[in-house]
Amino acid sequence: MAALLAAGAMAVGGVTPAAAAGGLLPHPGPDGLVWVEDMVGDGGVASGGAWDRLPTVLTVACEGGGAAHVTMDSQGYRVADFTVDCPTGTPGTGSVTLDPGVVRTGSFTIGVDASDDTVRWALTVTQPE
């Protein structure tokens, strides 16, 4: 499991401008597998359609004070695990890029554990070609 986490390059932290119309992250476009536009508190998503021959990028933005702990599982393996600081007033972002083959073909799940029920977050999963 540690080898899978080490296979991806992770960049967590930073601040990003809010997306159009007050969203935390813009729509991911044609490379997008998942877009969770706006959630508050704990949550997550399950999806299918991942392909193991492309890199996978998971990006989370949040605000409201506190933090969001993010995990991603693919076919029974934990492939990402990171925490994003969620400042008040300006969104914080965290992102992980997983090499081809780390996310396996088929379904995956992402969990977001917010430190407070008022933490607002959004996420995208893309597989750029």
Where are the predicted features?
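Secretory targeting and sorting signals
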Residues: M1-A20
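N-terminal, post-signal-peptide region of Sec/Tat-exported proteins
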Residues: W51-D73
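Beta-sandwich interaction modules
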Residues: G44-G49, P87-T105, T126-P128
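Noncatalytic modules at the cell exterior or secretory-pathway interfaces
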Residues: R53-T59, D99-V125, E129
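Solvent-exposed serine/threonine-rich low-complexity stretches and specific carbohydrate-binding patches
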Residues: D31-D38, R78-G89
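Transition segment at domain starts
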Residues: T16-G49, P128
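Short, surface-exposed beta-strand/strand-loop-strand elements in extracellular ectodomains
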Residues: G66-F82, L123-T126
